[in-house]
Curated annotation (Swiss-Prot):
This is Aspartate 1-decarboxylase. Is synthesized initially as an inactive proenzyme, which is activated by self-cleavage at a specific serine bond to produce a beta-subunit with a hydroxyl group at its C-terminus and an alpha-subunit with a pyruvoyl group at its N-terminus. The modification Pyruvic acid (Ser) is found at residue 25. The gene is panD. Pfam families: Asp_decarbox. GO terms for molecular function: aspartate 1-decarboxylase activity. Keywords: Autocatalytic cleavage, Cytoplasm, Decarboxylase, Lyase, Pantothenate biosynthesis, Pyruvate, Schiff base, Zymogen. It is found in: Cytoplasm. It catalyses: L-aspartate + H(+) = beta-alanine + CO2. The active site is at residues 25, 58. Belongs to the PanD family. GO terms for biological process: alanine biosynthetic process; pantothenate biosynthetic process.
């Protein structure tokens, strides 16, 4: 059996560009792509923290070191500059890979769209 698992996540990145008339996609700083394990043309889900919008598109490379998160084409209508988003990719993972210790790549952003941390799991949510 295979399970549809979270593979990659870029958490709380700020939208830096919205290019309505660019061919669809989301341009992501190449450093962030590498850190998260997302590759060019991979399907991604984007969740806008500010307005609750959730949509899918595909990743393209943005300028390395720029902090770029550019929503292009119709996706540009789903966010404003500065909105915080979560970018996620999923994978089909078989039971043997899971039992062998398969883990997702999670990247956490600071206020300047620079990486402030990495994790390989989502912590247990507690009531506090």
């Amino acid at each position: 059996m295979q399970r549809h698992m979270l593979k990659s996540k870029i958490h709380r990145a700020a939208v830096t560009h919205c290019e309505l008339h660019y061919e669809g996609s989301c341009a992501i700083d190449e450093d962030l792509l590498e850190a998260s394990g997302i590759i060019e043309n991979e399907r991604i889900d984007i969740w806008n923290i500010n307005n609750g919008e959730r949509f899918s598109t595909y990743a393209i490379k943005g300028e390395r070191g720029s902090g770029m998160i550019s929503l292009n084409g119709s996706a540009a209508r789903r966010a404003q500059l500065g909105d915080l988003v979560i970018i996620a990719a999923f994978a089909m993972v078989d039971e043997a890979e899971l039992q062998a210790g398969w883990k997702p790549k999670l990247v956490f952003m600071d206020d300047g769209n620079k990486i402030k941390g990495h994790r390989d799991h989502v912590p247990t949510q507690n009531w506090t």
